[in-house]
């Protein structure tokens, strides 16, 4: 029996710790914060429940065990299926019933595709962040950040297209500008220090800047439509504000590490800030999808006003 156990075990080394067996397929060991490699040490208030030092096969199998990444993985895996299902429903029911044009189909498809990519990249990172190869972990981290950029791009594409639906010039200006910003973020990831913990604050500033840029086209849209008193502005501006409020709330949870900061070790598996960040990200993207459908239906029900189309 002892020999069979040894043959079915994958051994790892924990620095100054002794060798521990990681049994296949169900005996994936969970570690404390002190035992994990430095690349995983992001939140000292999450004290236990870490997966680490696993090969790819066991990383995948860890999808079905309870760890401190379980909610992070499944929240965005379910988020992916949500947006995939919405894509099918939109293409087969919502858009045809609204007499949508070919452009509408393209824009809505791009938007939902970006959301799905964002969800899958996040799932991939949180699933394989426990890989025994630090190089592999960093590749998945880079994909996670790329996925966030793509998700932001999806919001901008649909938002700019329908906000400047009646003004082709400004629509092209803002779409090109946003695309250039996203590409700049991609190129920034090439820097060897981009994914290090020392650059964590800079990464946050970059993504806040890219997200916050949306205030500029929003204010321009308000001005083009006659100011805050215009009916269309009063109808749609609150939707933009709600989206930004959800994003801000999610970001505050992310950077503050609240509530686990006040309950260290008690929220290792459920209720941590990163899990709340994940759930709010899904809520935000879903809200923006619903807003996109709403404004698309509005654009097809009312013609463009002359004072906008000539500006």
UniProtKB/Swiss-Prot annotation:
Renumbered residue ranges of the record's region Required for interaction with SREBF2: 1-20
Entry GO MF terms: protein-membrane adaptor activity; ubiquitin-like ligase-substrate adaptor activity
Membrane association type: Multi-pass membrane protein
Gene Ontology CC annotations of this record: Golgi apparatus; Golgi membrane
Segments for region (Required for interaction with SCAP): 41-60
Positions on the Cytoplasmic side per record topology: 1-73, 129-140, 196-201, 257-275
Lumenal compartment residues: 97-105, 164-172, 225-238, 299-311
Keywords from the UniProt entry: Golgi apparatus, Membrane, Transmembrane, Transmembrane helix
Record region (Golgi targeting): 61-71, 299-303
Transmembrane segment boundaries: 74-96, 106-128, 141-163, 173-195, 202-224, 239-256, 276-298
Main location group: Golgi
Pfam families on file: HlyIII
Subcellular location: Golgi apparatus membrane
Top-rank taxon: Eukaryota
Organs and tissues of expression: Widely expressed in a range of tissues.
Assembly and oligomerization: Interacts with SCAP and SREBF2; the interactions are direct, increase in low cholesterol conditions and tether SCAP:SREBP complex to the Golgi apparatus. Interaction with SCAP is mutually exclusive with INSIG1. In hepatocytes, interacts with PPARA and HUWE1; the interactions promote PPARA poylubiquitination and HUWE1-mediated degradation. In macrophages, interacts with PPARG and STUB1; the interactions promote PPARG poylubiquitination and STUB1-mediated degradation.
Entry similarity comment: Belongs to the ADIPOR family.
Functional description taken from the UniProt entry: Golgi-scaffold protein which modulates its interactors acitivies by anchoring them to the Golgi apparatus. Functions as a spatial regulator of RAF1 kinase by sequestrating it to the Golgi apparatus. Acts as a positive regulator of cholesterol biosynthesis by mediating the anchoring of the SCAP:SREBP complex in the Golgi apparatus, thereby promoting SCAP:SREBF2 complex formation, potentiating SREBF2 and SREBF1 processing and enhancing lipid synthesis.
Name listed for the protein in its UniProt record: Progestin and adipoQ receptor family member 3
Lineage per the UniProt record: Eukaryota, Metazoa, Chordata, Craniata, Vertebrata
């Amino acid at each position: 029996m002892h020999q069979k156990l040894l043959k079915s075990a994958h051994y790892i080394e924990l620095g100054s710790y002794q060798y521990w067996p990681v049994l296949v397929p169900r005996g994936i060991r969970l570690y404390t914060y002190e035992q994990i490699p430095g690349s995983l040490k992001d939140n000292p208030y999450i004290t236990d429940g870490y997966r680490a030092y696993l090969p790819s096969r066991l990383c995948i199998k860890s999808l079905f065990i309870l760890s401190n990444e379980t909610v992070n993985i499944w929240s965005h895996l379910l988020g992916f299926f949500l947006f995939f299902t919405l894509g099918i429903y939109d293409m087969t029911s919502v858009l045809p019933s609204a007499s949508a044009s070919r452009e509408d189909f393209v824009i809505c498809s791009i938007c939902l595709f970006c959301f799905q990519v964002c969800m899958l990249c996040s799932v991939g990172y949180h699933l394989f962040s426990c890989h025994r190869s630090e190089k592999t972990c960093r590749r998945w981290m880079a994909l996670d950040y790329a996925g966030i950029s793509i998700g932001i791009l999806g919001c901008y594409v649909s938002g700019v297209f329908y906000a400047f639906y009646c003004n082709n010039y400004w629509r092209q200006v803002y779409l090109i500008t946003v695309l250039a910003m996203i590409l700049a973020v991609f190129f920034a990831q090439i820097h060897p220090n981009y994914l290090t913990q020392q650059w964590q604050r800079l990464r946050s500033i970059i993504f806040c800047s890219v997200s916050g840029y949306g205030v500029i086209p929003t204010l321009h849209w308000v001005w083009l439509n006659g100011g805050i008193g215009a009916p269309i502005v009063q109808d749609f501006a609150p939707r933009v504000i709600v989206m930004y409020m959800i994003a801000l709330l999610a970001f505050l949870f992310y950077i503050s590490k609240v509530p686990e900061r006040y309950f260290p070790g008690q929220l290792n598996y459920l209720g941590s800030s990163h899990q709340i960040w994940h759930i709010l990200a899904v809520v935000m993207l879903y809200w923006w999808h619903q807003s996109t459908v709403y404004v698309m239906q509005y654009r097809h029900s009312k013609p463009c006003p002359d004072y906008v189309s000539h500006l």
